[in-house]
Amino acid sequence: MARSDMIEVDGVIVEPRSNGFFTVRLDLENQPEVIAHLGGKLRRHYIRVVPGDRVTVELSPYDLTRGRIVYRYRH
């Protein structure tokens, strides 16, 4: 799937999960929570993500419950 097909949504890290996954609350009207993992560049550059951080998550149009964290906003 092309990167342009992905849906980008902002959210907040709620809690870390096992194996590098995180629960993220999205900034949408009904505030659904998704399970997301760190994208390649965040992992490669050892970017730390802690609960309360604002992030951008990429979601596939085929599965809106799982995603990839592609950006962490600075405080």
Swiss-Prot record:
This is Translation initiation factor IF-1 1. Transmembrane segments: none annotated. Belongs to the IF-1 family. GO terms for cellular component: cytosol. Pfam families: eIF-1a. Gene3D superfamilies: Nucleic acid-binding proteins (2.40.50.140). One of the essential components for the initiation of protein synthesis. Stabilizes the binding of IF-2 and IF-3 on the 30S subunit to which N-formylmethionyl-tRNA(fMet) subsequently binds. Helps modulate mRNA selection, yielding the 30S pre-initiation complex (PIC). Upon addition of the 50S ribosomal subunit IF-1, IF-2 and IF-3 are released leaving the mature 70S translation initiation complex. GO terms for molecular function: ribosome binding; rRNA binding; translation initiation factor activity. It comes from Symbiobacterium thermophilum (strain DSM 24528 / JCM 14929 / IAM 14863 / T). Keywords: Cytoplasm, Initiation factor, Protein biosynthesis, RNA-binding, rRNA-binding. It is found in: Cytoplasm. The gene is infA1. The keyword RNA-binding applies. Component of the 30S ribosomal translation pre-initiation complex which assembles on the 30S ribosome in the order IF-2 and IF-3, IF-1 and N-formylmethionyl-tRNA(fMet); mRNA recruitment can occur at any time during PIC assembly. PANTHER family: TRANSLATION INITIATION FACTOR IF-1, CHLOROPLASTIC. Residues 1-74 form the S1-like domain. Coiled coil: none annotated.
